[in-house]
Amino acid sequence: MAIPQRMSGLHAPQQCISRRTLLKSSAAMTIAMGMAASATAEQPVPGVSSGPFLAGKVLDCHAHLTHHSRPTWEVDDRKLIDAADKLGIDQLCCSTLTPRWPATLDGFRECNQWTADGMRRFPGRVLGYCYVNPGYGREALEEIRRYTGDHGFIGIKLYNEYTCTEPVVFPIVELAIELGVPILHHASHSHYFVEDQPRMSDGGHLAELARRYPEAMLICAHISGGGDWEWTIKALRNASNVFLDTSGSVTDADTVDMAAAVVGVDRLVFGCDSSMTAGVGKIRGAALSAQDKQKILGENMVRLLGRRKA
């Protein structure tokens, strides 16, 4: 399907923009003096090993497949891919989460099986995070090794079972460093989650973990979906190995612009966390250059994934 775009002028002809290029147009268009955007889909990103992650791709670093206890899970997963198609998102880094927390051993094992199934159902579109509860120690580590190895998962997803500075989390981080994979960590700095999620991590906790493990690749989830996002951005200013996922609120303005100004565009990674149009819109609407938008939309995540060791 093509979307007509009217040009200025009473008798100007119509141009058609495909749904696929709707998102990419803002990042790949030529800028001010006609300089072409440097990244193209055919060129590998410098410093990234050969593989399926190329410059020009749009990667959603934070997506979820539907838990199979929901009767509509197949339809919901298909809708996720359809939305990505319409918005020009090439690949989605997905986890499946348990509907109740803390996750049990059987619960997160089942979720990872379903994520692997999603990768098979949508080959090349869905990339998997291995979701674990660190409290299961050896079993959690074995699960990560199994799914990053045998199933090709690209990283680890941690939720709110433990604050990230608790020692029970450290073996997970050390394994992530060994494997060279990122950890996407659920986070919020908000008073209204305290009762329901007493062990929620925030930007300060992630900054502390980053100082303890400077080799770790940490992603702070949904910077604008967890309460005081300005506080979170400032807390992570000097945590150079923490990347900020742009997903979150559908109402807060200027989160991407502030994050770019405070921590720099090289540490921002595009995410939607299921709020697809809002996730895309905040990048399109940011007061950044085409090259900077492309870094956020894909290149920064590509670089993280390219650091994999095993």
What are these regions (language model features)?
Residues A36-T66, R70:
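C-terminal segment of N-terminal export signals and the immediately downstream linker at the start
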Residues H62, A84, T115, A176, ...:
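Conserved, mostly hydrophobic/aromatic
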Residues D90-Q91, D106-H191:
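Active-site gating/metal-coordination segments in enzymes
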